[in-house]
Amino acid sequence: MDKPPPVCGNIEVEPCGQRIVVAGDPAGLRSLAELLTWLADLDQESMAHLPEGERAHVHLYPGSQISGNSTELELCRLDAKGTGAFPRGFESAGDQARGTGYPEWFMDDPDNL
């Protein structure tokens, strides 16, 4: 698929201190997951309009794909077309990058959201 899938449901993106909170209803979270999967599976090498060394990305705009009071969201591939290089200054998440780090999970305490 050349075009990204549509964003459905409700998604909100907002800064909260040193964090970015991404919240959504079930449909919104599922469509965001589909968009991330699309971006991950995208064959950057076959994108003639994407220059070598650049990275595929999509923008989600407040009042359009995400809630009107959201902060604009840009979702990007880290690996550059042609080189696979990550951006200068990138720092790995350590164990999480190898699939062994689990996110903290807060189900019942709204103060942890």
Residue ranges and their predicted role:
Residues 1-113:
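Positively charged, low-complexity terminal tracts
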